[in-house]
């Protein structure tokens, strides 16, 4: 993805930038003192990062995924393209896409849960960028 990018690669690049920005929000929040940390925000933004990284990969493979926040489904679609995605465990990260944002499913994740969510997001980022043969400097991320 060097040189002049066509509209398809620009679109993928935008997904990757959005994904990375979500990860940055989570990483910045987790650096705060425990009493100031908003762990549900960390988990939510980690989930969003994973979702967007996986969708960016699927777009490059012309795989339709519809409107979904289900990481297991997206990961399954990715695994059909490349078996290495089958080695990724997203745990219960899909829970944080919607449920954690509303009081009817009230749950405050622990600091350890938040760290785990960021770890998953970092792993997915690493795999997606490797598969797309994109260096961090190419995206300024």
Q: Which residues does each predicted region cover?
A:
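Terminal alpha-helical segments
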Residues: 1-141
């Amino acid at each position: 993805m060097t040189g002049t990018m066509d509209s398809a690669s620009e679109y993928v690049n935008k997904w990757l930038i959005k994904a990375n920005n979500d990860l940055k929000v989570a990483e910045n929040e987790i650096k705060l003192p425990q009493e100031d940390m908003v762990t549900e925000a960390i988990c939510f933004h980690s989930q969003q990062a994973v979702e967007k990284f996986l969708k960016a990969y699927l777009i490059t493979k012309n795989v339709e995924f519809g409107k979904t926040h289900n990481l297991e489904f997206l990961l399954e679609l990715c695994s059909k393209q490349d078996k290495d995605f089958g080695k990724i465990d997203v745990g219960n990260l899909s829970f944080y896409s919607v449920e954690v944002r509303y009081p009817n499913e009230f749950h405050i994740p622990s600091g350890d849960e938040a760290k785990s969510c960021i770890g998953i997001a970092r792993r997915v980022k690493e795999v997606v960028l490797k598969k797309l043969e994109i260096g961090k400097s190419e995206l300024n991320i």
